[in-house]
Amino acid sequence: MIQARNKLSQEELSEAKKLINCCQAYDGTYRDPYLSNMLNFNPDMPAFFLYYEKGELVGLLTVYADDQDVEVAILVHPNHRRQGIARALYRSFEKETASYPIESVTF
C-alpha cells in the first residue's frame, strides 16, 4: 500500500531513516535523500511516497522540488527489490503530482 504525504510524521521519519540506512549499507552508498518539504515550491504537494507491506516500510520515494525541475530519490529494501515497488512508487508520484507545474524530473 502506498501513502502519499507532504510531510512525514516523527514515526514515518524514523522508519524512513531506518530504510535509508539499510539501503545505503547494502548498496555501499552515502547520499541521503532530502526528508523535508521546507524548500519545495509548493508545500502542499506530496513529497513523500511510502510503500508499506505487512505494516513495514519497504519502499520510499522522496521529492526535492525547490523549483519546477524536481529531483526524485527512490529506495527499496534489498529484500523487496525486483518486485515492481519502485515502479509503483513512481507511478503514484506521477498521478499525485500531475496537477502541479513540474517541468522535469531527475534522479
What annotation goes with each model-predicted range?
Residues 1-35:
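Short amphipathic alpha-helix that is part of the acyltransferase structural core
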Residues 39-44:
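Short loop/turn motifs at secondary-structure junctions and domain boundaries
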Residues 45-46, 71:
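Short coil/loop residues immediately preceding or within conserved phosphate-binding loops
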Residues 46-59:
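Conserved beta-hairpin
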Residues 69, 97-107:
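Conserved GNAT acetyl-CoA-binding A-motif
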Residues 73-83:
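A short, internal acetyl-CoA/4′-phosphopantetheine-binding micro-motif in the GNAT/acyltransferase core
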Residues 82-96:
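Conserved acetyl-CoA-binding loop-helix of GNAT-fold acetyltransferases
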